């Protein structure tokens, strides 16, 4: 499991407005936390036109490297740590540009300047 990998995971059970069900997620951490058996992820969900200007979403189109079936968004507002037991199959990987966009969106979600973190 590496940063930028896309996996199918089962996010159920959830509460309230948490994104749910079996869906793809992008892995954000490199797996250095070997004792934790947790990974930090952001979920992927189907594209909706009214999300066009949402700064927390990164658009991702289907392609050979990500192997997604439809235009989607990486929902950076729903960043979370999940157990490795939720992971199913590896689907693919996002591009370096998409990962950069994800990091920018997460810095907006968390209200931090990404340059301050370097």
Question: Residue locations for each model-derived region?
Answer:
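Conserved functional hotspots at enzyme active or ligand-binding sites that engage polyanionic ligands
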Residues: 1-23, 27-118
């Amino acid at each position: 499991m590496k940063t930028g990998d896309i996996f199918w995971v089962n996010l159920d059970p959830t509460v309230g407005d948490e994104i749910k069900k079996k869906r793809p997620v992008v892995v954000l951490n490199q797996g250095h936390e070997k004792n934790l058996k947790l990974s930090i992820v952001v979920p992927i969900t189907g594209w909706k036109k009214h999300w066009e200007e949402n700064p927390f979403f990164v658009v991702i189109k289907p392609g050979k490297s990500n192997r997604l079936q439809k235009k989607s968004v990486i929902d950076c507002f729903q960043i979370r740590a999940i157990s490795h037991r939720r992971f199913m199959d590896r689907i693919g990987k996002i591009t370096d540009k998409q990962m950069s966009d994800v990091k920018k969106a997460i810095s907006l979600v968390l209200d931090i300047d990404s340059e301050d973190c370097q």
